[in-house]
């Protein structure tokens, strides 16, 4: 591998493992970005459903379970909706934490790899 100053840097097994690990982390980072976007949309949908439920004046409402709508008492639907909101918020928080952890690991690997290979390696996204 050719460095900017004209000397060759040998890629050791450990270097290759770090490069591979960076690639896996980068892939997971992009997956998490998509999952976070979907989780935020789900949170918004649950919030909208809660708002619609507040406006509803019926004692029995239709509640979607999988692909089927079931008629359920309003109180049960409110309780289920609140539980779903809590679960969705926890999931979003967990995904955000994992994303931050991955970013920290990627930053550490960048420091190591750029320290050794300088301009001969590009870990930035275009």
Swiss-Prot record:
> Which Gene Ontology cellular-component terms appear in the entry?
cytoplasm; prefoldin complex
Pfam families, A to Z: Prefoldin_2
InterPro entries associated with the record: PFD_beta-like (IPR002777), PFDN4 (IPR016661), Prefoldin (IPR009053)
> Which residues does UniProt assign to the signal peptide?
none
Question: What are the GO BP annotations of this UniProt entry?
Answer: protein folding; response to cold
Q: Which UniProt keywords apply?
A: Chaperone
GO MF annotation list: unfolded protein binding
Assigned protein family: Belongs to the prefoldin subunit beta family.
Role description: Binds specifically to cytosolic chaperonin (c-CPN) and transfers target proteins to it. Binds to nascent polypeptide chain and promotes folding in an environment in which there are many competing pathways for nonnative proteins.
Q: How does it assemble?
A: Heterohexamer of two PFD-alpha type and four PFD-beta type subunits.
Its name, as the record gives it, is: Probable prefoldin subunit 4
Q: Which gene encodes it?
A: VIP3
């Amino acid at each position: 591998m050719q460095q900017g100053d004209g000397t060759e840097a040998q890629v050791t097994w450990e270097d290759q493992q770090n490069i591979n690990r960076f690639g896996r982390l980068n892939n997971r980072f992009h997956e998490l970005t998509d999952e976070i976007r979907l989780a935020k949309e789900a949170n918004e949908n649950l919030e909208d459903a809660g708002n619609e439920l507040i406006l509803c004046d019926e004692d029995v409402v239709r509640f979607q379970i999988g692909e089927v709508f079931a008629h359920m008492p309003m109180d049960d639907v409110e309780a289920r909706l609140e539980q779903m909101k809590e679960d969705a918020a926890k999931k979003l928080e967990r995904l955000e934490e994992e994303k931050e952890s991955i970013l920290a690991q990627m930053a550490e690997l960048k420091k190591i790899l750029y320290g050794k290979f300088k301009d001969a390696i590009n870990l930035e996204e275009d």
